[in-house]
Amino acid sequence: MSARHSVFAAALDAIGKTGLDSLLAPLTRGVGVVLTLHQVRPWSARGFAPNRILEITPEFLDVALISLKSLGYELVTLTEAVARLRTGRGRCPFATLTFDDGYRDNLECALPVLERHGVPITLFVTPGFAERSARLWWIELEEALRRLDRVSIEDADFRFAAMARNDAEKAAVFDDLYRRLREGSEQQLLDVVAALSAEARIDTQGLVDRLCLDWDGIAQ
């Protein structure tokens, strides 16, 4: 968990404990909400999990849907949500769910929960993942750092060196490296992560095969 995410989590926890969330809800919830989700899968306990912000558990999804209904939200399609924003119609606030990228667990873990609640969703598929032509570079980076105790990158345009002996050091390296790579070109990012993945013997193609649906799976 990044420092920024920790601050947000602490702030939200404090608001919840004071009861301000209930008092402010009628004034702050607006006409509706769009929940943008990625992975939905059982939690695998691990100390180093920098991409945890991109996943929730099926149990969390179930509780979230129950909570939305109890708060008076109507779960609608994205098309209906857009129509309500344009026309202002609707007697109660709406909630709509979207899932990004096309992860396999959306089908295996999220769909049973969604079907049980009768909730429509919108799936935004990354064609490169479905066609196996793109890489999950942020997950590659996490898995590489999990295996490596030291990171040393000597490139003409990018240099980086740090120890990664424990969860705290690995988290710090991930945050720093992630930030610096995102500031540069996409090709440099992919090249650096590819080099680290090769050093850590990460099967980058197998990672996409294991975590992402292909077009046949998406059609289901």
Language-model features: where?
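Catalytic alpha-helical scaffold of carbohydrate-active enzymes acting on polysaccharides/glycoconjugates
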Residues: M1-Q220
